[in-house]
Amino acid sequence: MLSPKRTRFRKQHRGRMKGISYRGNHISFGKYALQALEPAWITSRQIEAGRRAMTRNARRGGKIWVRIFPDKPVTVRPAETRMGSGKGSPEYWVAVVKPGRILYEMGGVTENIARKAISIASSKMPIRTQFIISA
């Protein structure tokens, strides 16, 4: 699972996901990519599940690039705890994804293999996505 080695602060505010992604919205490594169409928090487990699905489907050959990284800690309070007494402890990590952001890239395989692998990875994602090809 992906997570930062160390962070400056243990806990973060939730923030909000306004607008579209202006960074990381162009294919820069491979030839095919999976692009987000909705804003969401994508957990490190979901990123890993998508990556595994793609590698398993592409078999040998081909290279995969994961273009998002979970750098936001999500805190969770224990069950049946009264209100107050501070913020919960960090439980898992998420990547904040805005519409237009490239999630995965793929190269070194034919288009139909890439399309199949990326469609399986997209089913692991909690958002609507689209398959794009670099111009």
UniProtKB/Swiss-Prot annotation:
Gene Ontology MF terms: rRNA binding; structural constituent of ribosome
Subcellular location: Plastid, Chloroplast
A family per Pfam: Ribosomal_L16
Source superkingdom: Eukaryota
GN (gene name): rpl16
Family: Belongs to the universal ribosomal protein uL16 family.
Residues spanning the membrane: none
Name of this protein: Large ribosomal subunit protein uL16c
Subunit structure, as described in the record: Part of the 50S ribosomal subunit.
Organism listed in the record: Panax ginseng (Korean ginseng)
Entry keywords, A to Z: Chloroplast, Plastid, Ribonucleoprotein, Ribosomal protein
Primary subcellular site in the record, as a coarse category: plastid
Entry's Gene Ontology cellular component terms: chloroplast; mitochondrial large ribosomal subunit
Entries under InterPro entries matching the protein: Ribosomal_uL16, Ribosomal_uL16_bact-type, Ribosomal_uL16_CS, Ribosomal_uL16_dom, Ribosomal_uL16_sf
One record GO biological process: mitochondrial translation
